[in-house]
């Protein structure tokens, strides 16, 4: 009995620490990129996955203590995928007392009609979904659209573009939408996926599976994700350091002539960003600069995904 109580106290203690870290990460991202301003109405895109549930809860939590006033409205797009449990999100949101809107649009049929059997449908589905969400944001009078992408998503996108697209391009924490009418924010930009997963497990969110459409998985993204997870296990701190590198770009030491004017470097030019250090072996720390020891964790749990029958 006493052992169960101790485990319960330890579990609650770890959950509180985890929530504080997620709050801090989200708060720092909001401040660094000026994501939320006085009077904003934020459309929180809710898919039923661990990331969007966590984003909604942390934003609601911050809303109570923020020095500015802003409102939230959760939006889910029901794309009429076979077996989609349409009751899950309304029941959860009503229980939580969250303002919400469910948008019903049968994009599934459109995608199935346009994309040959066996081919990935993600690209077309994403474009259709994006347009509907932009329209919905306008209808609801929202000034910002919040998406649940986290730090691992951003790094995966960076490596996908480097390996397959020949670009140094990631996923920005804040951007202007394709139509130039909406500001899109990613409040979880500083959050680790493993923290989000642990938080979602502890909160017992009613997770909706993401493969209801039957689409083929994005194998390239899957390979990159596996690579990053392997690095995270074998080289603790590497992921943190790579993300820090994305925030410390030195254009003069890359090779993009559009980003830096190399042609103007001549005899007598000033030394820029330390000059040429190519022949000097820089002293690097034994541990990655952003490395932090892991906190004590109980036996790894698993997300309780809603069973679709």
From Swiss-Prot:
Keywords: 4Fe-4S, ATP-binding, Cytoplasm, Iron, Iron-sulfur, Magnesium, Metal-binding, Nucleotide-binding, RNA-binding, Transferase, tRNA processing, tRNA-binding. The keyword Glycoprotein does not apply. A motif (PP-loop motif) lies at residues 47-52. It is found in: Cytoplasm. One of its GO terms (molecular function) is magnesium ion binding. One of its GO terms (cellular component) is cytoplasm. Its cofactor is Mg(2+); [4Fe-4S] cluster. One of its GO terms (biological process) is tRNA thio-modification. The keyword Nucleotidyltransferase does not apply. The thiolation reaction likely consists of two steps: a first activation step by ATP to form an adenylated intermediate of the target base of tRNA, and a second nucleophilic substitution step of the sulfur (S) atom supplied by the hydrosulfide attached to the Fe-S cluster. Belongs to the TtcA family. This is tRNA-cytidine(32) 2-sulfurtransferase. It comes from Erwinia tasmaniensis (strain DSM 17950 / CFBP 7177 / CIP 109463 / NCPPB 4357 / Et1/99).
